[in-house]
């Protein structure tokens, strides 16, 4: 008793001195301070920078900075919380600190009284609830700590609504919580066996135990509050694991086996009974109760969120509603804060496809079933997500060990990004709403005796909010309950493997997906990408309300395929958006890259993961220690690894499509094939040559027999009179035999009754989508052939397919775009692809012995219908440029007669013809560049530079070009805030006029295009070849003026004036080319020489032909000229060779240069633009 009085006296003294704590440690420090009144002159510990570098710190108060920080220009900070010191060896609590033990017992008794009172109150609430089920707050009293098995932590059952602690729970909120499901058990069933090698609880460690510790208001533990689907719970099959292993169910898939495409229906929301279910032993819960039939969506209708959402703070509600639109997105829905672990793409994030999943029966009956409380996931995707947390929140102070099989079930999270974050600005204030609750939950008692290799999360990131005490987990504390800690291996593909897994883990995700929410992805795509080129050939309403309504319930053997396909479609779309986002200077398209060591001396990231603070410090170190070339190579390697990962994952599932072709829904097939279009779009967008992706895509499309839909007659969607929801069937209930089943070997039909996942849908309603997808792949095939000069892989003509398959009725369910104005821009980009397809199919080098210009003339006449009087988009202007280029090539090559070996006479009419073609070509080039400069010079997604929203389905805009410039459109454009200080000034500077074409072209403002880099390369090539021609023609005109009459002199003067204007335009083109930077990831040098890979030609031929510098190589023989000469000499007419070898006359030197330029332009068309 005297000792207790002494303690009280010391405590009061320490309080007077400014102390705020009555803990024994503070008492000892206060007693020691009384004996040593002398103030310290040196820091009692090293500053954070010196401790990080593990060097001696000489910090003093009078200087305020240590010598090391002063030398590096840093400031000394002591923000890091000191770690608790562990006991020394041979330490005995009973003999060493008897007084401290008594105080600890006293505090523990007070804690027990607090928990007993709270438990009694909760038990009374349970008795009042009656048959309504177990409330999530009804927690059994703390068991005897000596020989009992620890139940899941108490914080697991406490609702985490905005981080409200148990003591601040509002009784009114609890009264509004829905009752539990009928038939659930009301009482706990304690596990009948103990887990061996599990640390027993003790009274002394009670307050440090997370399972009985109260929550701080500023601390929110992200526990998984949703019951894990049994399909996503994999079990270990090791025979030696007799007692089972305590593992977590940290998957982010839906609780009812459905994707979170449902807008958090009441049954899928984490109600109180789901919280109670989460903590029960799976062996004591029947499978029907753990996955009730009520979780099925009846009709796929979205339901209201749970009433608990009303209890959230007002500020938190506003943040959640910023990016949340009222869409009936089936899977691409914004996750509610109560349901973070219902993320729609979590099951197959980085673990590949597994045909074997845990069955419902085996999980309910297995005595070694895992505990149903969650633990920390070790998936690098989730670990990277843990680094971003809102202010006022802290991560748990523990890291749980996982079994190898459970680690494969971790999932990416869905994080709603603010506008600044999406623009590439680092969000240092923590404005990101982290909607994942399954990543950081777990139990500090989670161990496994059979774990051979285990990975823990990095040291927790301290919170930066004012008023909260930052805390960190200690390595020594973790070692006390972690069986074995091993640093994971990092290989070239950045993977983490588990030796104890029943199935080896596949390569981990290269970048952390889930940083952009599902709703934001779809909105961003249709706002910035779809108008430039339709990757998903469907309007937004049908995509979100019909196509993405995919059932992943375990009612068939293809639910894994559905989940897997949609996951990697979503990840590929996020990869495109993140690459296309406008980045800040020095920023990267990836933020949470996993597994890359940021600094050789960085010891804080031993597991290979990065945190937000570590990234900030390491970014500065990287800029100081790495040059620009190394940073570029790093970004390129990460991008290639991420692209290859998405491509490999989506290809791996193809055998399952072949096996279950009759059962897979057409919706999944459309999404699956759209993923290949998406990956080819990414390659074209960054200008990267990867023919393997295109070749495999063509193979997959041919496996689905999509070419039959284009080759064989079938009624178009415009000709289908019945509604789309009706089935056009024959008498036996099957579809028409004239329609081909996608993926079958021949024409056939589908029986809806044999396809439980097809939702009784007739595949004929999706045939137009498959046709569109095939046309889109053919466009990318043509683009790659034009850009890199390779042969075309798809030789089926798509001429006229734009009008047949894409420009259907706007009121149709399957229309491409619901706005007529936006649809016109989409169709123009498709016509550009159609034109490139026809040009590559009719190449001279690919079509035997044909005269140069024969196919060019035919193509120009056939495709002239694409050119309108007022071009509205870059794609349409580029179509006009390509046709003008081929006409110009034909005009130049006609100056020389290869049969007779003579040049034509350069008359005034011929000179006028050449000048008109040249001036027209240069004028179109300037229009293309100025329009690109005004609309999107960087070809990036900038949320501060959004495209205007035209009125949807306005009948006044469908009549003609004059009606399109009506007042509604002009009013909408004028209402949009201008991003430039004076738009009219810049338009006048660029030579643009305020006419109908200019107004309509603004609809493409901010839109990205896959043709941007290819267009810039081609424009540069043409400009470099023809920029000296106006000067040559002017010289010829001035020379010929002396021998002409008055009328011809007036005509020649007009030509000279026109050519002078063209020279001025060439200067403008040269300056504008330096202002357009559409390059992403890979830097393209427009004037970089490319070595010829043609076997029979010299390596220097291609250099001078394609990129002549300062007039070099104007007389060099072109590749196509050499090829055609060889074909002509190998024929049966060798008599023309001596005539062609005659020395040209001096007066024909200019004509010879013009013909040489024509051949080089032909080389550019035949051998590629890059």
From Swiss-Prot:
Residues 473-488 have a biased composition (Basic residues). Residues 1-22, 139-149, 411-422, 445-457, 493-506 have a biased composition (Polar residues). Residues 113-138, 239-250, 293-302, 309-323, 385-397, 424-444 have a biased composition (Low complexity). The modification Phosphoserine is found at residues 202, 205, 208, 229, 283-284, 410, 414, 1130. PROSITE patterns: ZN2_CY6_FUNGAL_1, ZN2_CY6_FUNGAL_2. Glucose-responsive transcription factor that regulates expression of several glucose transporter (HXT) genes in response to glucose. In the absence of glucose, it functions as a transcriptional repressor, whereas high concentrations of glucose cause it to function as a transcriptional activator. In cells growing on low levels of glucose, has a neutral role, neither repressing nor activating transcription. Binds the consensus binding site sequence 5'-CGGANNA-3', of which multiple copies are present in all HXT promoters regulated by RGT1. This is Glucose transport transcription regulator RGT1. It comes from Saccharomyces cerevisiae (strain JAY291).
């Amino acid at each position: 008793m005297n000792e207790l009085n002494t303690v009280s006296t010391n405590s009061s003294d320490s309080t007077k001195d400014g102390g705020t704590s009555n803990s024994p440690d503070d008492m000892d420090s206060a007693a020691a301070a009384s004996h040593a009144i002398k103030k310290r002159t040196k820091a009692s510990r090293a500053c954070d920078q010196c401790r990080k570098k593990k060097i001696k710190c000489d910090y003093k108060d009078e200087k305020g900075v240590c010598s090391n920080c002063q030398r590096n220009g840093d400031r000394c900070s002591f923000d890091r919380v000191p770690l608790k010191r562990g006991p020394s060896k041979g330490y005995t609590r009973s003999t060493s600190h008897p007084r401290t033990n008594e105080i600890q017992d006293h505090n523990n008794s007070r804690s027990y009284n607090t928990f007993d009172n709270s438990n009694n109150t909760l038990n009374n609430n349970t008795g009042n609830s009656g048959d309504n089920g177990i409330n999530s707050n009804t927690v059994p009293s703390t068991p005897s700590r000596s020989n009992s098995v620890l139940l899941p932590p108490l914080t697991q059952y406490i609702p985490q609504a905005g981080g409200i602690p148990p003591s601040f729970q509002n009784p009114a909120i609890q009264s509004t919580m829905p009752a539990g499901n009928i038939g659930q058990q009301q009482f706990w069933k304690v596990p009948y066996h103990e887990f061996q090698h599990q640390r027993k609880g003790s009274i002394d460690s009670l307050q440090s135990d997370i399972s009985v510790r109260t929550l701080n208001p500023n601390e929110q533990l992200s526990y998984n509050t949703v019951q894990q689907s049994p399909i996503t719970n994999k079990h270990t099959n090791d025979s030696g694991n007799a007692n089972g292993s305590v593992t977590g169910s940290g998957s982010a898939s839906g609780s009812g086996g459905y994707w979170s495409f449902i807008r958090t229906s009441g049954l899928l929301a984490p109600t109180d009974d789901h919280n109670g279910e989460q903590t029960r032993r799976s062996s004591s819960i029947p499978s029907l109760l753990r996955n009730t039939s009520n979780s099925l969506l009846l009709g796929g209708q979205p339901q209201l969120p749970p009433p608990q959402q009303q209890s959230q703070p007002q500020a938190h509600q506003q943040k959640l509603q910023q990016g949340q639109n009222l869409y009936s997105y089936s899977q691409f829905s914004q996750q509610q804060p109560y349901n973070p672990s219902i993320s729609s793409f979590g099951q197959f994030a980085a673990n590949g496809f597994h045909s074997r999943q845990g069955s419902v029966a085996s999980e309910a009956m297995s005595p070694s079933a895992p505990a149903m409380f969650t633990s920390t996931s070790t998936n690098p995707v989730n670990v990277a997500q843990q680094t971003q947390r809102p202010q006022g929140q802290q991560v748990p102070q523990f890291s749980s060990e996982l079994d190898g099989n459970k680690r494969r079930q971790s999932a990416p999270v869905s994080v709603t990004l603010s506008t600044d974050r999406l623009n590439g600005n680092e969000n240092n204030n923590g404005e990101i709403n982290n909607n994942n609750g399954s990543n950081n939950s777990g139990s500090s008692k989670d161990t496994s005796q059979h774990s051979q290799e285990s990975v823990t999360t990095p040291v927790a990131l301290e919170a930066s909010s004012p008023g909260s005490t930052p805390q960190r987990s200690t390595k020594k504390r973790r070692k006390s309950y972690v069986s074995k800690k091993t640093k994971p291996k990092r290989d070239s593909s950045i993977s983490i493997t588990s030796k104890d897994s029943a199935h080896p883990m596949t390569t981990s995700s290269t970048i952390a997906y889930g940083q952009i929410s599902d709703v934001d992805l779809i909105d961003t795509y249709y706002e910035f990408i779809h108008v430039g080129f339709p990757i998903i050939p469907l309007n937004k309403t049908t995509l979100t309300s019909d196509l993405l309504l995919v059932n992943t319930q375990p009612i068939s053997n293809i639910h894994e395929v559905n989940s897997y396909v949609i996951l990697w479609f979503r990840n590929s779309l996020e990869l495109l958006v993140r690459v296309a986002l406008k980045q800040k200077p020095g920023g990267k398209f990836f933020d949470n890259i996993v597994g890359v060591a940021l600094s050789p001396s960085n010891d804080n990231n031993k597991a290979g993961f990065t945190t937000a603070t570590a990234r900030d410090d390491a970014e500065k170190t990287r800029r100081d220690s790495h040059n620009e070339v190394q940073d570029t190579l790093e970004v390129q390697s990460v991008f290639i690894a991420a692209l290859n990962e998405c491509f490999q994952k989506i290809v791996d599932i193809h055998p399952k499509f072949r096996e279950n072709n009759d059962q897979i829904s057409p919706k999944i097939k459309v999404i699956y094939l759209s993923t290949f279009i998406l990956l080819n779009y990414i390659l074209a967008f960054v200008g990267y040559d990867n023919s393997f992706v295109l070749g495999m895509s063509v193979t997959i499309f041919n496996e689905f027999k999509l070419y039959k839909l284009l080759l064989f007659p079938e009624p178009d969607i415009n000709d289908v009179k019945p509604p789309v929801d009706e089935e056009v069937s024959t008498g036996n209930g099957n579809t028409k035999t004239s329609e081909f089943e996608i993926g079958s070997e021949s024409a056939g039909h589908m029986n809806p009754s044999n396809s439980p996942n097809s939702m009784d849908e007739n595949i004929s309603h999706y045939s137009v989508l498959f046709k569109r997808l095939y046309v889109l792949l053919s466009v990318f095939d043509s683009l790659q052939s034009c850009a890199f000069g390779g042969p075309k892989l798809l030789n089926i003509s798509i001429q006229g397919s734009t009008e047949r398959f894409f420009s259907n009725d706007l009121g149709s369910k399957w229309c491409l775009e619901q706005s007529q104005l936006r649809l016109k821009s989409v169709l123009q980009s498709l016509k550009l692809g159609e034109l490139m397809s026809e040009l590559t199919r009719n190449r001279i080098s690919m079509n035997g012995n044909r005269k140069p210009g024969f196919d060019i003339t035919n193509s120009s006449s056939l495709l002239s219908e694409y050119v309108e009087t007022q071009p509205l988009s870059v794609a349409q202007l580029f179509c006009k440029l390509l046709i003008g280029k081929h006409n110009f090539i034909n005009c130049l090559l006609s100056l020389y007669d290869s049969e007779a070996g003579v040049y034509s006479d350069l008359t005034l009419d011929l000179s006028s013809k050449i000048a008109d073609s040249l001036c027209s070509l240069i004028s179109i080039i300037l229009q293309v560049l100025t329009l690109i400069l005004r609309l999107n010079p960087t070809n990036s997604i900038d949320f501060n530079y959004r495209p205007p929203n035209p009125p949807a389905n306005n009948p006044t805009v469908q009549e003609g070009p004059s009606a399109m410039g009506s007042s509604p459109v002009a009013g909408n454009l004028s209402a949009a805030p201008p991003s430039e200080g004076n738009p009219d000034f810049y338009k006048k500077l660029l030579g643009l006029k305020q006419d109908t074409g200019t107004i309509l072209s603004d609809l493409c403002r901010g839109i990205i295009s896959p043709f941007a880099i290819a267009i810039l390369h081609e424009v540069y090539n043409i400009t470099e070849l023809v920029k000296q021609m106006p000067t040559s023609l002017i010289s010829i005109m001035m020379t010929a003026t002396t021998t002409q009459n008055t009328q011809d002199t007036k005509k020649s003067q007009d030509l000279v004036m026109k050519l002078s204007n063209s020279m001025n335009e060439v200067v403008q083109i040269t300056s504008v080319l330096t202002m357009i930077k559409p390059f992403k990831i890979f830097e393209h040098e427009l004037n970089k020489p490319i070595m010829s890979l043609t076997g029979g030609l010299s390596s220097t031929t291609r250099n001078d032909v394609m990129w002549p510098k300062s007039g070099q190589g104007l007389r060099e023989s072109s590749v196509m000229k050499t090829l055609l000469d060889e074909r002509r000499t190998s024929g049966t007419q060798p008599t023309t060779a001596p005539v062609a070898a005659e020395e040209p006359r001096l007066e024909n030197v200019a004509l010879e240069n013009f013909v040489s330029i024509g051949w080089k332009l032909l080389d550019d068309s035949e051998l590629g633009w890059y």
